Amino acid sequence: MNVIVDPKKLIKGATGDWEVVIGLEIHAQVTSNAKLFSGAATAFGGAPNEHVSLVDAAMPGMLPVINAECVAQAIRTGLGLKAQINLKSTFDRKNYFYPDLPQGYQISQYKQPIVGEGVVIVDIGDGESIEVGIERLHLEQDAGKSLHDQHPTMSFVDLNRSGVALMEIVSKPDMRSADEAKAYVTKLRTILRYLGTCDGDMEKGNLRADVNVSVRHPGEPFGTRCEIKNVNSIRFIGQAIDYEARRQIGILEDGGTIDQETRLYDPNKGETRSMRSKEEAHDYRYFPDPDLLPLEFTAGYVEELKAKLPELPDEKRARFIADFGLTPYDAGVLVSERESADFYEAVLAKLADGTRDGKQAANWVINELFGRLNKEGVAIDASPVSADQLAAIVDLIGEGTISGKIGKDLFEIVWTKGGDPKALVESLGLKQVTDLGAIEKMVDDIVAANPDKVAQARAKPQLIGWFVGQVMKLSGGKVNPQAVNDLLKSKLGI
């Protein structure tokens, strides 16, 4: 069988090239004030067992009642993933014993999930993208948390998370490198944040990944996969995949076989280790939950939710490229977080009609603002420079009141001290020199003082940039560099 495989994604081995095959199961905590089947709060950081109802604690006689908002959030997510929405789905009991699972089973969806197949378009750099298929999305309860470090001889259980709604988003095994897997999780998290269905906070455990990894020679059937459980950072996902792929290749090249098992990733050692043999579905003895009726809703309800969806990153990126002439890269940077895209659009909305330049605004948001935010470790919603202030700076440059260099100085002043950019230009005397006579005198002075450079510039016209720089320096950045450039060309006969 002839199979075309990108050689950059292959791993060199003693017995030839190997291809890694990756599928991900993402557990995303649903953004909701209450849990999936109870009215207990979902707030993070409460005292142990503060947010626990009788349902969450599995007290006898307590019956689950579905949270309609969690259902709506799952449908919104399915729509955002361009997936099939199933108008009828059912809940099942997944039976296993663990101390932080008080019911002795987890309420999940097995045979009939709420969302079927979908797709995510993932940018992987250099203008390339891949399609990652979505197998399904289903709703389920989260478990509690066992605490083993509170007492030398006892373990404790915190049920605050017990019963919190999760969306398990199962991908198809369509990824072929750690970088692709990381890009997929990043894109999926962005979509969830745009939709407002999950905050994607991996540090709080609100987004976790089970990573399925297998290896094969290109063109061969899929190998035996191992599942790496509960990886809680995008960086660790990449590290776990790289280690696990090489571990499996080493075993196979030594003549061994891969055991289908569940493994854990240890970020301190940078390795995976065996946790238990991988269970099959029959090990969990799934059966329909007798306490919950099938979940049914109408196509009209789905359309109602669809009509209220926000513009998603792919559509927003395409609009930025088409309407504002942005490069695909710049548009991608701006839409990578909803807050970033909103800030950019707020800047555009404040620009004067005559100077509305989408590219110029994007350059200032990406290079100056994002660069400074990253350097200082400040979130965009806490930016010292507001969208109104940045728009004013871009306007001042666009209308020729200040130069680009002075614009950067003005940005620094606003960042550190605040203030109205237009008022600061007046009070600090930052206006651009527009008197052609004054500009011509500066040009003449620089030309007269550097006859050797004049000869060089006539031989190599690109050296005119040196003269422009000297005039800018002499003026304190207050002249228009294009006007200086044109004047120099005339003076030097270039």
UniProtKB/Swiss-Prot annotation:
The keyword Hydrolase does not apply. It catalyses: L-glutamyl-tRNA(Gln) + L-glutamine + ATP + H2O = L-glutaminyl-tRNA(Gln) + L-glutamate + ADP + phosphate + H(+); L-aspartyl-tRNA(Asn) + L-glutamine + ATP + H2O = L-asparaginyl-tRNA(Asn) + L-glutamate + ADP + phosphate + 2 H(+). GO terms for biological process: glutaminyl-tRNAGln biosynthesis via transamidation; translation. It comes from the Bacteria. Its EC number is 6.3.5.-. It is an enzyme of class 6 (ligase). Keywords: ATP-binding, Ligase, Nucleotide-binding, Protein biosynthesis. SMART domains: GatB_Yqey. It holds the Pfam family GatB_N. One of its GO terms (molecular function) is asparaginyl-tRNA synthase (glutamine-hydrolyzing) activity. Heterotrimer of A, B and C subunits. Belongs to the GatB/GatE family. GatB subfamily. Allows the formation of correctly charged Asn-tRNA(Asn) or Gln-tRNA(Gln) through the transamidation of misacylated Asp-tRNA(Asn) or Glu-tRNA(Gln) in organisms which lack either or both of asparaginyl-tRNA or glutaminyl-tRNA synthetases. The reaction takes place in the presence of glutamine and ATP through an activated phospho-Asp-tRNA(Asn) or phospho-Glu-tRNA(Gln). This is Aspartyl/glutamyl-tRNA(Asn/Gln) amidotransferase subunit B.
